[in-house]
Amino acid sequence: AASDVYKRQTDTEIALRLGITLGSKEMILLGATGGRIDHLWANVQTLSVACDAGVNACILDEKNKIWVTNKSCVLKKSEAYGPYLSVFSLEGEIYDFSLEGTKWPLNHHDLMPCDSLTVSNQFVDDEVKISFVNGRIVIMETKD
């Protein structure tokens, strides 16, 4: 590891926090999906640090773009990383969650961390609207 073996944060989190301190407004994490699943999950959770700081950050690899948001958003099909879209709660129950413009829309659903209902949806309309009233969600744009 690049830092002390007894550290309290992963190297990825240390680097991300440094980027925020240095004023970065956008960060792309490469090499963050390979190898150990525990590190992948820690990297996904670490995206919350950037989200809370107002920094656009994502994990990117050949088939996936993963990011975290705490705000409703609109995704454009023309800018999507791939045809598939999965959404997960990152922290507790997400109230009043809605998906519009997808093959399997949802309307005012309370999204639980254990829900698989929002896995592998697809863009149908030119824009997908994701809305919710609390918490953070993980958005995964994927392709085969």
Spans of features found by a protein language model:
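Short, small-residue-biased leader/transition segments that mark boundaries at the very start
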Residues: 1-6
